[in-house]
């Protein structure tokens, strides 16, 4: 479990060394830093080993750990079985006077855990202190309890209470029989789920060290953390969003500044080129080496000429991710010429092999710029299309998010989609709980029911971070109508199914447009004669939904509300089509 974390720690220390700052010796860092414990107690534990689940955060906010012993106990308690002891432990920590021991002999054993049995070692100590077991025999009891050997434990109960050869027994040691019987019951209930303390302590060391690095070196730590999850788009998105929430900028991918992997850059995190889809890490390593040896790329065509191993899919993905934005051209322009540019560079490289020719040798020494392959005077992609292409090429929205306009509404909801995805039934969210979340409908599919009596809806509901499977029964699917389409922003209410063997799913029983109740779409026209209005309404009718539309006549300074049958669903597809038809500057949601 700790291997990934050890890699993150190693890479974090490497980034710190690169920055020229002193590298902390974690073996010498004391486990007593109040600021680190305050961060943990606040639930700010993204990326902290063993402490980042929603339920654990909630527990930590109640516990408010302030010492290493609390971390060891917290990791041990937050498991099925021992979890029942959490309220008692928290109460004991914050009110030591409430701690009650079944017998005085238990106090020195359980005082550090406020009267609660938390570790297997405590069970071993109890049978030794109360009944006179040897070290070896106490370990046999621990093993029998953990493996639920009931026949063995029935005998051990009698030995614990009344003794046997080599065992004094609790009664002979001054413990009342009823008390001894009760203590043995508590050990039985607890021991089958218990951690051993040494195991929990090893986990707590990693938990503290990752928390320490997160607090004092957040840029380096989050960069290393993101790199450790490059194969998981949802997890990368989660930590990118976490960085932004901590005021850390995540800079876009750029062929002149990015490395193959994510890297710290001037107090920010630079997106790694290898995280762009269809772009091989090996090719990007070659690119970085070329840039390091021969300087930054002067322009798009210089990049095509100097980097070996490129293909058209790679170039398209790099353009869509914004990797050439700093060179001054528009993404739409690069998308229009990249195939010709790559063909030209391949031809020149072949010629170079025979005659030492380069792109700079063409046309009497002129560089291959717009004179040879001109960048078209094309308008930039609409913001919606740009976001879609960013998502297609990186798995993330880089220059914004389709849900940004709904941020205030989403903040008012009790849960987020990533919290539903991570729920394990032990935290705030329980299995089959009714929840309401906001997100984007994606991967929408319809399939017949087994009886053939209707259609089921299957989709993935995506939040700003995280995603959860969504299921709609025929009645709900029929009611959803136009909302069951890709990229539709929705407010979904339903029952969460928490499953151990596969991803959680949300059984949706009600779905509404997200934020549409308070917004209207305004479309501005220089003038609005009847024929223009008729064509506009015909366009709107192709995107039926709940958002009211106002057609504004600039010449008369009058707004006309479109009839309800021309209300629209605000999706990425609709906004892209509307911007193309009416002009980006002529449509507005408010």
Give the predicted meaning of each segment.
Residues 1-590:
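Noncatalytic, beta-rich nucleic-acid-contacting surfaces in large DNA/RNA-processing enzymes
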